[in-house]
């Protein structure tokens, strides 16, 4: 079996269908004895250029190990699904399991915002932090 990296983009009006689509594609791959090494739902993102007058799409990244038959069936499912506006399949030399740079950036953004929220919640004196800034400057 070979390793593949698959990215597909779903029409933004069909975003609520993405989890069902992922499960269907997972069944195709695992039903043929394949494995999914990495699955990332990147969510809605701005497109670099409009596709059929659409400016946003829901992105999904999958790193899989599967046979030729399962891959052909998966690509066929992409082609005949009107909700999938683009897809790309790349042959990889090995399986990638670590988070992609985009997913790492999102995790850092989430941790930064939660730390910022915790810091804001800990400041309970009700002022605008002007006296806190003056005290730290002294």
UniProtKB/Swiss-Prot annotation:
GO terms for cellular component: cytosolic small ribosomal subunit. Residues 100-138 are annotated as: Disordered. Binds together with bS18 to 16S ribosomal RNA. Keywords: Ribonucleoprotein, Ribosomal protein, RNA-binding, rRNA-binding. Belongs to the bacterial ribosomal protein bS6 family. This is Small ribosomal subunit protein bS6. It comes from the Bacteria. GO terms for molecular function: small ribosomal subunit rRNA binding; structural constituent of ribosome. It comes from Thioalkalivibrio sulfidiphilus (strain HL-EbGR7). Residues 121-131 have a biased composition (Acidic residues). GO terms for biological process: translation. PROSITE patterns: RIBOSOMAL_S6. Pfam families: Ribosomal_S6. The keyword rRNA-binding applies.
């Amino acid at each position: 079996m070979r390793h593949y990296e698959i990215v597909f983009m779903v029409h933004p009006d069909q975003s609520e269908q993405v989890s069902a689509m992922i499960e269907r594609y997972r069944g195709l791959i695992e039903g043929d004895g394949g494995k999914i090494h990495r699955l990332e739902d990147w969510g809605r993102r701005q497109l670099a250029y409009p596709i059929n007058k659409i400016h946003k799409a829901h992105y999904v990244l999958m790193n899989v190990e599967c046979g030729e038959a399962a891959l052909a069936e998966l690509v066929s499912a992409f082609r005949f699904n009107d909700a999938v506006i683009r897809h790309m399949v790349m042959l990889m030399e090995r399986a990638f399991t670590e988070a992609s740079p985009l997913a790492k950036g999102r995790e850092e953004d989430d941790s930064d915002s939660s730390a910022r929220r915790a810091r804001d919640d800990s400041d309970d004196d009700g002022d605008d932090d002007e006296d806190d800034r003056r005290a730290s400057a002294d």
